[in-house]
Design a protein with these regions (language model features):
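Conserved alpha-helix/loop element of class I SAM-dependent methyltransferases that forms part
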Residues: 1-11
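Conserved SAM/SAH-binding beta-strand->alpha-helix loop
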Residues: 43
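Conserved SAM-binding loop
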Residues: 50-51
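A short SAM/SAH-binding and catalytic strip from SAM-dependent methyltransferases
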Residues: 83-96
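A short glycine-rich, Lys/Arg-flanked "PGG" loop and its adjoining helix->strand segment in the class I
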Residues: 98-110
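Conserved beta-strand signature within the Rossmann-like core of class I S-adenosyl-L-methionine
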Residues: 111-119
């Protein structure tokens, strides 16, 4: 799935809301030693689980696990340095998606991708993908496609949709 979404060896990726690192591990394997994966999470228990999983399956020089509370203010991820951002099953927990999307755009290289998986399983605070497409377009992130994949959701595999956006000029 990750390569079909455009991730390549040597890329720099952001796994925003990485949880226990279920997508961070395969991302790190795709980008390889020449690449980098920033994994961002705010939940301490999930961070500990991600550290354990990453120690078993990922090169520690490839993955940078960051706590999300102060990431933008600290400037931990360089602007215009990211090829692909993944926000999988996390947007329902974000109170200000406008601010988050602007931050994502600031991190993306030209033609960089944002991939969103809103999760079909009901959560508090549903995600309106039509509204997201409108918001992304307003800030210069062009809708590319919606593709169905087998997605990891907690301990389950579900058929669901990933929506892709590309940074356009500016």
């Amino acid at each position: 799935m990750l390569t079909s979404l455009g991730v390549k060896q040597g890329h720099h990726a952001l796994d925003f809301g990485c949880g226990e690192g279920r997508y961070t591990v395969p991302l790190s394997q795709v980008v390889g030693k020449e690449g980098c994966v920033y994994s961002v999470e705010r939940n301490e228990e999930a961070i500990l689980a991600a550290k354990e999983r990453l120690s078993l399956f990922s090169d520690p020089d490839v993955v940078r696990l960051l706590k999300s509370d102060d990431i933008e203010a600290a400037g931990l991820i360089p602007k215009k340095s990211i090829d692909a951002i993944f926000a999988f099953d996390v947007l329902q927990y974000i109170p200000d998606s406008d601010k988050l999307f602007l931050y994502f755009r600031s991190l993306l290289k030209p033609n960089g991708m944002v991939c969103i998986y809103p999760a079909a399983i009901p959560h508090p605070g549903d995600v309106d993908i039509k509204l997201i497409i409108t918001k992304m377009k307003k800030i210069g992130l062009q809708y590319v496609k919606s593709t169905e994949y087998k997605m990891m959701h907690s301990a389950d595999m579900v058929d669901d949709i990933v929506h892709s956006f590309k940074r356009i000029a500016g």
